[in-house]
């Protein structure tokens, strides 16, 4: 097959790209080429900015070598305008178009619901989820062989799955290793379904040019589920540390960490369980579930610990967590150590760790300036 992957260097698309290559396909990936660590050297890289380059320029780059593709997989569309532009550029020059949506688009009726593809969609509690739903609605009106894929929380060697975690995910591991408290939502009791990217890739691959997948939507998830607290406990065991949490309820989360409020009340702070019968029927067997949670998390931890370029610390997040831990559970902590810590990192930490003090200092300085 000639396969075009829009993306190809993210956590979800990297293992899928590898799977397609390992199966002997010709794989093109379109991305900006910035994350060279995660771009497989076997791919035919189309270096382009899908959001900002003119459509005619992008079309010329995409179809420079071949006039059409068997399958195009879109990991990059997050809002309907993205999808509309992408399909305009592609101009129907493919057999199957696969849109990577999200299982967060489901609009759950209750915490005990086992989600199927017939469950209601349109989760209005989180903008990301609702926009994925809007993308799906747009795609369903298109006269193409589309397939909608709804992954849930996926993880792999370069992603640590956790509900409250910054973009620089090593920060979480660093806090655990430093015996600092980790912020959890409602004791970490919410049930999560975590899917390793290798297992996701195997199932998705079997939907390529599968006529049972045309004009259909599927979620692809693991068959096991566990509370988030168990995920944290395993991480602590892998790092040879004892668990130490600071739990926030819903009101405290909205007050102290509003940037995480939507994703928690609309997704990761709720129970998420799935029935994979539909996709299993389409591929003729059960979904792949070959990587255990412990083995998958060990793979992630080892990758972060063995690659210095992954060991970035978000000192704003570190300071924010220490402020909350001191405020809520009276646990006092110091800034994380790092051989590459900069002066501005220390400043960021202290601004977040001592917000009231910094506010008063700034107010005092402003008053002095006004008096001059």
Question: Which residue ranges define each predicted feature?
Answer:
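Conserved Rossmann-fold cofactor-binding substructure of NAD(P)-dependent oxidoreductases
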Residues: 47-68, 81-82
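Short-chain dehydrogenase/reductase
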Residues: 113-136, 153, 162-170, 193-194, ...
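Mid/C-terminal beta-alpha module of Rossmann-like enzyme folds, strongest
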Residues: 206-264, 276, 299, 310, ...
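Substrate-positioning beta->alpha
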Residues: 164-172, 185-208, 215-216
């Amino acid at each position: 097959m000639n396969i075009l992957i829009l993306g190809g260097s993210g956590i979800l698309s990297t293992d899928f790209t590898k799977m397609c290559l390992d199966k002997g396909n010709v794989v093109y990936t379109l991305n900006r080429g910035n994350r060279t660590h995660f771009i497989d050297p076997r791919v035919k890289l189309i270096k382009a900015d899908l959001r900002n380059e003119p459509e005619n320029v992008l079309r010329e780059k995409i179809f420079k070598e071949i006039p059409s593709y068997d399958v195009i997989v879109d990991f990059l569309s997050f809002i309907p305008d993205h999808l509309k532009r992408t399909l305009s550029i592609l101009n129907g020059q493919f057999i199957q178009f696969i849109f990577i949506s999200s299982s967060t688009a489901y609009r759950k009726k209750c915490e005990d619901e086992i989600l199927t593809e017939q469950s209601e969609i349109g989760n209005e509690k989180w903008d990301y989820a609702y926009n994925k739903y809007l993308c799906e609605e747009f795609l369903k009106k298109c006269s193409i062989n589309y397939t909608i894929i709804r992954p849930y929380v996926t993880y792999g060697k370069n992603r640590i799955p956790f509900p409250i975690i910054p973009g620089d995910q090593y920060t979480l591991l660093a806090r655990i290793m430093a015996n600092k408290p980790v912020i959890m939502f409602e004791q970490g009791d919410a049930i999560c379904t975590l899917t390793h990217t290798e297992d996701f890739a195997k199932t998705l691959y079997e939907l390529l040019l599968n006529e049972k997948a045309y004009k259909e939507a599927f979620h692809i998830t693991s068959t096991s589920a566990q509370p988030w607290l168990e995920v944290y406990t395993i991480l602590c065991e892998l790092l040879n540390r004892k668990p130490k949490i600071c739990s926030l309820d819903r009101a405290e989360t909205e007050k102290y960490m509003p940037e995480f409020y939507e994703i928690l009340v609309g997704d990761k702070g709720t129970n998420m369980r799935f029935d994979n019968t539909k996709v299993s029927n389409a591929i003729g067997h059960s979904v792949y579930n070959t990587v255990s949670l412990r083995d998958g998390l060990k793979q992630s931890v080892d990758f972060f610990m063995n690659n210095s370029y992954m060991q970035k610390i978000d000192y704003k997040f570190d300071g924010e967590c220490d402020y909350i831990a001191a405020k809520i559970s009276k646990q006092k902590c110091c800034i994380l150590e790092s051989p590459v810590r900069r002066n501005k990192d220390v400043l960021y930490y202290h601004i977040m760790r001592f917000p009231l003090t910094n506010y008063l200092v700034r107010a005092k300085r402003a008053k002095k300036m006004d008096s001059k």
